[in-house]
């Protein structure tokens, strides 16, 4: 049975790159009726926290990436935190020490740094040259009597070609002579990544390791441990780096990189999942919008590119805007409420039926202007009380047209004649005014829009008027007429 895993370090939030790795593992597991495990690589004791671990799990759940075994769900292959598996690592450490594939190293940091500097001065690759490879029991005893705490190093075989048939990158060959003996257990007894990950993948029966390209250089070290222990090696698939639109590695300077940042801004999870799936995976055909189920059916490692993926925020915004337009209005209302409350546009506490209806109408009125839901805050000034923003530039010039006072007066007259201010009652007024004044549509619509919002573009006028309400509309129109009177 196919088994895959996602193994984040709980030292911070789930980032876009990690979310993509989790997604690709999830998709392959679902496609092949396999098992998806999520575990925690928490051996960085200073930086790891249960809070970060939980936040990562919540981010995965928000993306609807569900796992079969692991953190917070349990399973038959636990425990799923590395700090709870130390006794298991010790068993395998003892096996490597007994077979001579590992040894204790007592070199100090100063000695290692000097060796590193000497190799660099010769133009050679920095690596450990094996000073402690053949220590006698007496030499070990002397070091320990001096208070030196050893690490455990893996004895790298010399002159070996390490071949990796990567499912994404093809055949990759490494030379063991360029690696040097590396640490597998630190002096405090905590295993290093390259050792612990092998034991975890083995004991959890992982068949496929799908992870970021940055781990490719670790793979020969892990393969050597598999071979020394006589363990089967999983299939590897190293997915490409994610670059910004300038072709550089993503960083904080490129904006938000954590999944929670996009959740906080009101991106829809299905849009984020769709977007990150297309960073490195090319589905068959021309379609670019997929449900999670559709992605599962179409996914294969053969269609994952080894070329760098590009994080294009404009593409994410485009995709999210599409999903917003497709979303249920009630869901969008729920998403909009916290942002509107935050700015005081609606009251705290449970909304009345009328207040909730106002939010629903407001969101639908501006839906074509939304790339993410936090932008509902950007249009409130159009539709709530108070003066409209003062028009400037071309907008002010349009208001100074000679037909404008008559258009505004006629609009006021017709509004006052309505029994109720609703979209269906307001919408016909503009055609009526156009017909009665014999003016072009733009000569009617634009002055009214600018008078009410101060802007030349925005939501439909027949939406703005009911949202503002008659009192606010009349107030803003009166303010505009006063502005014009003062400038004439």
UniProtKB/Swiss-Prot annotation:
* Keywords assigned: Aminoacyl-tRNA synthetase, ATP-binding, Cytoplasm, Ligase, Metal-binding, Nucleotide-binding, Protein biosynthesis, Zinc
Motif placement: 'KMSKS' region: 249-253
Q: Where is this motif: 'HIGH' region?
A: 8-18
EC number(s) recorded for this UniProt protein: 6.1.1.17
Q: How does it assemble?
A: Monomer.
Q: PANTHER family, from UniProt?
A: GLUTAMATE--TRNA LIGASE (PTHR43311), GLUTAMATE--TRNA LIGASE, MITOCHONDRIAL-RELATED (PTHR43311:SF2)
In Swiss-Prot or TrEMBL terms, this protein is called Glutamate--tRNA ligase
Q: Which organism is it from?
A: Desulfitobacterium hafniense (strain Y51)
């Amino acid at each position: 049975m196919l088994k895959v895993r996602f193994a984040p370090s709980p030292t911070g939030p789930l980032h876009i790159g990690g979310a993509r790795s989790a997604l690709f593992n999830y998709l392959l597991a679902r496609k092949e009726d396999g098992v998806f495990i999520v575990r925690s690589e928490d051996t960085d004791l200073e930086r790891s926290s249960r809070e970060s671990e939980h936040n990562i799990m919540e981010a995965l759940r928000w993306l609807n990436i569900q796992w079969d075994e692991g953190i917070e769900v349990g399973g038959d292959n636990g425990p799923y935190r590395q700090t709870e598996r130390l006794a298991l690592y010790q068993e395998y450490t003892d096996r490597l020490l007994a077979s001579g594939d590992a040894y204790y190293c007592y070199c100090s940091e100063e000695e290692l740094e000097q060796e590193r500097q000497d190799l660099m001065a010769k133009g050679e690759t920095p690596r450990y040259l094996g000073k402690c490879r053949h220590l006698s029991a007496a030499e070990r005893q002397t070091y320990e009597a001096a208070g030196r705490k050893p690490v455990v190093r893996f004895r790298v075989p010399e002159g070996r070609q390490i071949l990796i048939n990567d499912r994404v990158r093809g055949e990759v060959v490494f030379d063991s002579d360029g690696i040097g003996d590396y640490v597998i257990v630190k002096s405090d007894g905590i295993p290093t990544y390259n050792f612990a990950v092998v034991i975890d993948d083995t004991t959890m029966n992982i068949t496929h390791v799908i992870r970021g390209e940055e781990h490719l250089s670790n793979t020969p070290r892990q393969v050597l441990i598999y071979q020394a222990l006589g363990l089967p090696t999983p299939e590897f698939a190293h997915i490409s780096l994610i670059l910004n639109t300038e072709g550089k590695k993503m960083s904080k300077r490129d904006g938000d990189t954590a999944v929670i940042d996009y959740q906080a801004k009101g991106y829809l999870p299905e849009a984020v999942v769709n977007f990150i799936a297309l960073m490195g995976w090319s589905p068959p055909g021309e379609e670019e919008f997929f449900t999670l189920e559709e992605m599962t059916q179409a996914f294969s490692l053969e269609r994952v590119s080894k070329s760098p993926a590009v994080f294009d925020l404009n593409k994410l915004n485009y995709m999210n805007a599409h999903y917003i337009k497709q979303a249920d209005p009630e869901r969008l209302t729920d998403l909009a409420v916290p942002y509107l409350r935050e700015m005081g546009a609606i009251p705290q506490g449970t909304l009345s039926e009328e207040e909730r209806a106002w939010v629903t109408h407001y969101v639908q009125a501006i839906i074509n202007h939304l790339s993410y839901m936090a932008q509902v805050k950007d249009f409130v000034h159009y539709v709530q009380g108070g003066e409209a923003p003062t028009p400037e530039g071309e907008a002010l010039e349009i208001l100074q047209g000679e037909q404008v006072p008559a258009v505004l007066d006629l609009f006021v007259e017709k509004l006052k004649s309505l029994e109720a201010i609703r979209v269906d009652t307001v919408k016909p007024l503009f055609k009526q005014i156009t017909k009665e004044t014999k003016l072009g549509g733009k000569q009617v619509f634009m002055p009214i829009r600018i008078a009410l919002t101060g802007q030349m573009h925005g939501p439909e006028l027949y939406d703005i008027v009911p949202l503002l309400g008659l009192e606010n509309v009349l107030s803003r129109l009166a303010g505009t007429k006063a502005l014009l009177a003062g400038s004439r």
